[in-house]
């Protein structure tokens, strides 16, 4: 993470973040994207997932979807997490919904969004979650937000 400028860039003409992975501090993320009650509610759900992922050893979460666009009231958020160092037994015991990627409704009920491992294959696209998250519905490239869970304090 050293050397990354931690400033979320302005949106492009389509309301998306410019191409790339944009590292942000939690406070900046909340300030930028938590600008109404709906968004703050989604952030609360995201925080629950982030606490569980950090406790299980995940180092990074990537946030995507309409939540990181100019849409004023997104329906949910989409996220994927670095699972290289995750203790899956910890998740299985403490956060089983994070391991059930097919129960999207269950994830949305608990976390108010959908969360996948970065290397989770997506349908028949031949790509994983991390790659898919960097494209819009028309498959044009766009940016996403990254939060360093190792630096993140949730107290």
Regions found by a protein language model. Name each.
Residues 1-62, 68-74, 84-155:
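Catalytic core of pol beta-like nucleotidyltransferases
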């Amino acid at each position: 993470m050293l050397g990354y400028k931690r400033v979320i860039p302005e949106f492009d003409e389509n309301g998306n973040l410019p191409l790339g992975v944009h590292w942000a501090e939690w406070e900046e993320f909340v300030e930028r994207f938590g600008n109404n009650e709906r968004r703050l509610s989604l952030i609360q759900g995201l925080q629950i997932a982030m606490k569980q992922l950090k406790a299980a050893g995940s180092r990074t979460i990537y946030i995507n979807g309409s939540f990181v666009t100019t849409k004023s009231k997104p329906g949910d958020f989409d996220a994927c997490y670095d699972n290289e160092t995750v203790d899956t037994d910890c998740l299985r015991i403490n956060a089983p919904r994070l391991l059930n990627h097919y129960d999207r409704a269950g994830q949305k009920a608990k976390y108010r969004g959908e969360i996948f491992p970065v290397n989770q294959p997506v349908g028949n696209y031949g790509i994983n979650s991390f790659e898919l998250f960097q494209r819009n519905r028309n498959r044009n490239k766009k940016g996403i937000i990254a939060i360093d869970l190792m630096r993140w304090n949730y107290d």
